[in-house]
């Protein structure tokens, strides 16, 4: 747990850490030795303010609304708003807050490292059903949310298929290993940005078959990258 985020193990998480230590000791393991033997490596991890995380996590657990200031990287705007926290998400080494935004009157996902101020309010948080949260925030690939879901059909070369066929990109994915060794993967997505960014690292070993809009976006991204080297 210390390796997840050492500065964030405040009063809310310390009891959990102590309980895990007790369980390991009962099994004959020393917690200190376990920490030395297990390493968690994070690439692209963004640091967050421990005080901000403490306020957000405590309000989430205690079911209070939060007044926060958040920087939207897509619009480059900083906006103050009140939210009803629902859950905290750790995704690829970074922390996010799923919440009901009282300003937009809709579900939103906030990167906690982009929150500059946070204050727990006395008002009780609005409760949103798990089904509604999953429908709004959890249908597509990656961290970006949306309800307008399409399906990406991707074909990986034989050399790349050895790895990709054993990976889970989405709970509803469909994968088929072809006789020639290539691997076709169908993945639901609601926002193409993260999917394209991930596909670019595979270079010539992956092809977007459809939809045409995603294929065109991928082509433009590859052409833009190529121009940097010509």
Residue ranges and their predicted role:
Residues 1-71:
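Bulky hydrophobic/aromatic content
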Residues 80-82, 109-112, 151-153, 184-186:
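Well-ordered beta-strand positions in beta-sheet-rich domains
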Residues 88, 118, 175-176:
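A structural signal for short hydrophobic beta-strand segments in well-ordered beta-sheet cores
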Residues 103-136:
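Flexible linker/loop signature enriched in Pro/Ser/Thr and Pro/Gly
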